[in-house]
């Protein structure tokens, strides 16, 4: 393993190096061991993301929580913190626990269709680069079409889970590319 690849993976911020390096040391006893663990994880993630998509359509919060818990543990065992953190959100939101006080900014429903990631805007403290706003200001020019469900609504929790899932997928894609480079 080249030092450059090792350093690049460490610098990526995608991996808790203390955890991942323990797994890599097992390659000394069995060549390719860590890579095989990553390959199994990739398969698990792909299957579980499909299950999560199904449970989102069904609005099955219990199964969503269980799937989030499963992936959280698998990701954490490999030191894949970005994925693990988002899966922890899925797990907690499935139990209707907003442990990180995540706020929905706005949900616009399309007719009778279920809330989906395409029509959810969330406020996670980021500012709009176009106008510098953080999305909390109200405009006198637009009508208030806000349809933000409260925490008693399953749609609220589904929207939070969809946000966490989108971020978990992004973290997975980034981690997969970084690990593919590492193992080349």
Swiss-Prot record:
Record-stated family: Belongs to the YPD1 family.
Listed name of the protein: Phosphorelay intermediate protein YPD1
Keywords: Cytoplasm, Nucleus, Phosphoprotein, Stress response, Two-component regulatory system
Species whose genome carries this gene: Candida albicans (strain SC5314 / ATCC MYA-2876)
Region (Disordered): 120-152
Superkingdom assignment: Eukaryota
Residue stretches making up the HPt domain: 30-125
UniProt xrefs under InterPro entries: AHP1-5/YPD1 (IPR045871), HPT_dom_sf (IPR036641), Sig_transdc_His_kin_Hpt_dom (IPR008207)
GO BP of this protein: osmosensory signaling via phosphorelay pathway; phosphorelay signal transduction system; regulation of cellular response to oxidative stress
Keyword Membrane (UniProt): no
GO molecular function ontology, one term from the record: transferase activity, transferring phosphorus-containing groups
Coiled-coil annotated residue ranges, if any: none
Protein task: Phosphorelay intermediate protein that is part of the bifurcated SLN1-YPD1-SKN7/SSK1 two-component regulatory system, which controls activity of the HOG1 pathway and gene expression in response to oxidative stress and probably to changes in the osmolarity of the extracellular environment. Catalyzes the phosphoryl group transfer from the membrane-bound histidine kinase SLN1 to two distinct response regulators SSK1 and SKN7.
Chief localization: cytoplasm
Cysteines paired by S-S bonds: none
Subcellular location: Cytoplasm; Nucleus
Any GO CC annotation of this UniProt entry: cytoplasm
Bias kind Low complexity: ranges: 125-147
Chain positions with Phosphohistidine modification: 69
């Amino acid at each position: 393993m080249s030092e450059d690849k090792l350093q690049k993976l460490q610098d990526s911020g995608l991996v808790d190096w203390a955890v991942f390096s323990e797994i890599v040391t097992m390659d000394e006893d069995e060549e390719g061991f860590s890579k095989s663990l990553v390959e199994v994880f990739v398969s698990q993630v792909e299957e579980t993301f499909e299950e999560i998509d199904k449970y989102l359509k069904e609005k099955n919060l219990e199964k969503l929580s269980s799937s989030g818990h499963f992936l959280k543990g698998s990701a954490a065992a490999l030191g894949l913190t970005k994925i693990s953190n988002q899966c922890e959100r899925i797990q907690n939101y499935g139990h209707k626990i907003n442990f990180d006080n995540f706020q929905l900014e706005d949900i616009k429903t399309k007719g009778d269709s279920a809330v989906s990631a395409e029509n959810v805007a969330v406020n996670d403290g980021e500012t709009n680069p176009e106008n510098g706003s953080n999305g909390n200001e109200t405009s006198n020019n637009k009508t208030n079409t806000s349809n933000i469900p409260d925490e008693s609504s399953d749609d609220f929790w589904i929207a939070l889970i969809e946000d966490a899932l989108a971020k978990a997928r992004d973290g997975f894609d980034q981690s997969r590319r970084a690990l593919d480079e590492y193992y080349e």
